């Protein structure tokens, strides 16, 4: 920096101080959903389908996504562009809730193709894409990963 000041990364202690119980619950549920999603999607692929695994992993994934979406409403950020602390990434909350509702509605109507497409979109949109956004510099997880673990920032 031009004035001779050094940029320093927050210490692990400082990062932990920012990790509130709400953020810890949100992050744990999101990481669980990110890991479990492929199992639920995989169990219905190929010649040998595994409906029990698909159903168990699917219900667990839906539960984790509901926890992730609801807990996100209690996490607000006033530094980024926001409305009352809600940033653009919060738009994934109604996307997730309506998507899960729609996926179960498709199941009730026995429209398996629409159910499958909805769940795939939810996984890649609400898990993978949202996860990528959390790794941006300046966000808690991004600062932890890029600054503390890899020392890039």
What does each model-found stretch correspond to?
Residues 1-153:
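Alpha-helical membrane insertion/targeting regions
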């Amino acid at each position: 920096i031009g004035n001779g000041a050094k940029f320093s990364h927050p210490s692990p202690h400082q990062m932990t101080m920012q990790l509130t119980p709400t953020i810890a619950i949100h992050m744990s549920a999101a990481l669980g959903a990110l890991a479990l999603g492929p199992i639920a999607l995989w169990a219905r692929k190929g010649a040998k389908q595994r409906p029990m695994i698909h159903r168990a992993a699917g219900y667990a994934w839906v539960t984790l996504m509901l926890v992730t979406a609801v807990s996100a409403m209690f996490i607000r950020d006033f530094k980024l562009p926001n409305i009352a602390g809600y940033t653009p990434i919060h738009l994934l909350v109604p996307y997730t809730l309506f998507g899960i509702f729609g996926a179960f509605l498709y199941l009730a109507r026995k429209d398996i193709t629409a159910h499958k497409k909805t769940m795939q979109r939810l996984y890649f949109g609400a898990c993978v894409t949202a996860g990528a956004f959390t790794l941006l510099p300046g966000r808690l997880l991004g600062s932890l990963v890029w600054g503390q673990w890899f020392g890039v920032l």
